[in-house]
Amino acid sequence: MYVGNAGADAALDRGWILGHFKDAGDPRHSEDVEIKWGVHPAGDERAQWVRGEARTALLVLISGRFRVELPGRSVLLERQGDYVVWGRGVDHSWVAEEESVVLTVRWPSVPGYAVAAGE
């Protein structure tokens, strides 16, 4: 069992609180799903599109204003609880239009998808 605080724990691992990247003995280790508590200052962005995505993703807006760019569509999350889901093979990028907190759930949890900071 593990009891924590998403904001405090996320700050220790680039926002991630559950997934394959946690130690095997940690209850937060999972190869099936990964969860991120993303805290983004206004203007924070993933300018480089994530390509060849092998996971399904769900993003839920907790607070702020957050835009997700998908092929042929721009999705604005602006009310608490707004969410977007996309499947495997869908490229994407994003920008925090205001300071935002976003809960991301992706499955499966696949190694090798980290994008370098600032990209």
Model features per residue range: what roles?
Residues 40, 51-68:
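Short, conserved beta-strand element in jelly-roll/cupin
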Residues 72-89:
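Short acidic-glycine-tyrosine-enriched beta hairpin
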Residues 1-3, 12-15, 95-119:
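Double-stranded beta-helix
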Residues 27-29, 46-53, 70, 76-77, ...:
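Short histidine-centered beta-strand/loop micro-motifs
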Residues 65, 91, 99-101:
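Structural motif
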Residues 1-42, 46-49, 118-119:
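A short, N-terminal "cap"/entry segment at the start of jelly-roll beta-barrel domains
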